[in-house]
Amino acid sequence: MVTSTPHVSRDNSILIFDSGAGGLSILREVRKKLPVTRFHYLMDTACFLYGNQSDSLLERRIPELCKAAVERFDPAVLVLACNTASTLALPLLREVLDIPVVGVVPA
């Protein structure tokens, strides 16, 4: 019998991505629930203020940054702590990454 197992990270860490420092509040709350978990925080300071950038630029940039960070840090989960990133890149990242990707979007 062949069974499929989910991606298991070497350090079982969580990668949190935001365009700036706003996602630090999400990091703080997740850390309260998972105090022994290792976290990586990825902030896109080169294109900060996503509202001033074109969707086409961000649709290319966000997946590139996140994929590179996943390859480098090998997290168990990617959290997009940015509404714009979640709206523009969440479906694509779920397709191309072999780890769960969680986004934040307005209700």
PLM segments and residue spans:
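Non-catalytic structural scaffold of enzyme domains
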Residues: 2-107
